[in-house]
């Protein structure tokens, strides 16, 4: 194990501990660590703090008693939190010796030091207690095999697997053994995701091992549910486009389905016009599925794919609607000249479908579809009448379907700028409508 960092990284864990003092849960962790000699900050948290980045959550290891440690930490956080703040939630997974503390301001994951073995490729690991070294060597990549002990006697030192600190300084992703991707093929998705997030590249041997694992159809040895969990993490990245593009470049998408593809430029165009109340993750997912729309039984193909990945029914159906209608919506938007025509083309569509159709139209001269999609997303979809069906009933219009048709005609005229402002003009337009 290495105890000091190479050039470009802190020589010891001093800066890590200083930064930890300022993070949610950090002071409480340091307080608990004073009472025992086995607590260390590890994994992504240690990696990010050494790089000078703020970690998404804090990862901690102890020799034993992860559940008890989590409960003690939860109590300490609750005691120092402002009044009326919700108490942290503690989740325990006894099989793996892990626990987590979640609260509004942060999250701490606690694990017992362990070694892992795999009965078969892709199987969940068999876990037993392990040493500091074994716990580091079980991890996915060397840059995540770094620990900063919090116990007073070791505080300020670093513990790292071979090559870990050098790889971190050089921006390299390296697996810790040759069977890593076969043991746990989700590491293929993590290789792309970490590379995209951190701007790191795969070390030469690791890149070859990844290619070999994909060629051996390693992803077929794990459940689609596990793939789906990793894909959702990629979709949640700050730069999800880069993460998905990396998955495509690595060959993961093609290994999952031959029709699955990702066009980063198209995706970025769609995100550029998607409003804040849209779902970027669903837009990106729909863009990935466009290749299935031309396939025989394309809707069923997409349904089975997303269902296998265990997306929620609501998200699954919204993505399928978006992917299926975006190409035809492009045709409708090309022909839409009046605001009312744009509105009618898009009114029943998802926001993601409008943005994706607009992105598809960006390659055309003058970009009429893109302009129409952007105009609807920004302004037209928010246009409302001041009147409603009760106003028409009060004016003597009989109840029935014509109420809706008259309101629609009035809305169209308002969208097209044919009405003066005010309820009276809208009511007059509705009453004059030819229905």
Can you annotate each of these PLM segments?
Residues 1-435:
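Catalytic cores of the polymerase beta-like nucleotidyltransferase superfamily
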């Amino acid at each position: 194990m290495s105890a000091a960092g190479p050039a470009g990284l802190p020589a010891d864990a001093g800066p890590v501990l200083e930064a930890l003092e300022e993070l949610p849960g950090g002071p409480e962790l340091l307080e608990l660590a004073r009472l025992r000699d086995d607590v260390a900050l590890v994994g992504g948290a240690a990696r990010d703090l050494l790089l000078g980045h703020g970690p998404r959550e804090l990862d901690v290891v102890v020799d034993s008693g992860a559940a008890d440690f989590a409960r003690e930490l939860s109590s300490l956080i609750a005691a120092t939190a402002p009044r009326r703040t919700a108490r942290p939630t503690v989740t325990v997974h006894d099989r793996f010796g892990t626990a987590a503390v979640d609260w509004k301001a942060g999250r701490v994951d606690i694990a017992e030091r362990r070694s892992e073995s795999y009965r078969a490729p892709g199987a969940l690991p068999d876990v037993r207690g392990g040493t500091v070294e074994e716990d580091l060597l079980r991890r996915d990549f060397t840059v995540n095999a770094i620990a900063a002990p919090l116990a007073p006697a070791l505080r300020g030192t670093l513990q790292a697997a071979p090559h870990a600190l050098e790889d971190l300084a050089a921006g390299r992703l390296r697996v810790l053994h040759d069977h890593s991707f076969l043991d746990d093929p989700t590491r293929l998705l993590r290789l792309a995701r970490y590379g995209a997030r951190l701007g790191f590249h795969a070390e030469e041997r690791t890149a070859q091992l990844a290619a070999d694992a994909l060629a051996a159809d390693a992803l077929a040895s794990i459940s689609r549910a596990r793939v789906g969990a990793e894909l959702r993490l990629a979709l949640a990245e700050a730069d999800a486009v880069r993460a998905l593009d990396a998955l495509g470049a690595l060959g993961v998408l093609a290994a999952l389905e031959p029709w699955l593809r990702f066009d980063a430029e198209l995706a970025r165009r769609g995100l550029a016009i998607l409003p804040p109340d849209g779902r970027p993750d669903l837009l990106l997912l729909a863009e990935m599925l466009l290749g299935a729309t031309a396939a025989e039984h394309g809707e069923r193909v997409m349904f089975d794919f997303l269902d296998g990945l265990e997306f929620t029914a609501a998200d699954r159906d919204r993505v399928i609607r978006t992917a299926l209608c975006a190409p035809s919506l492009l045709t409708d938007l090309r022909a839409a000249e009046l605001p009312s025509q744009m509105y009618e083309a898009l009114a029943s569509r998802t926001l993601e479908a409008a943005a994706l159709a607009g992105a598809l139209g960006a390659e055309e001269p003058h970009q009429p579809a893109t302009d129409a999609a952007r105009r609807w997303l920004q302004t037209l979809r928010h246009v409302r009448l001041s009147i409603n069906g009760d106003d028409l009933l009060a004016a003597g219009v009989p109840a029935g379907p014509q109420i809706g048709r008259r309101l629609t005609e009035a809305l169209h005229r308002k969208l097209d700028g044919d009405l003066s402002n005010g309820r009276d003009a809208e009511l007059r337009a509705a009453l004059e409508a030819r229905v």
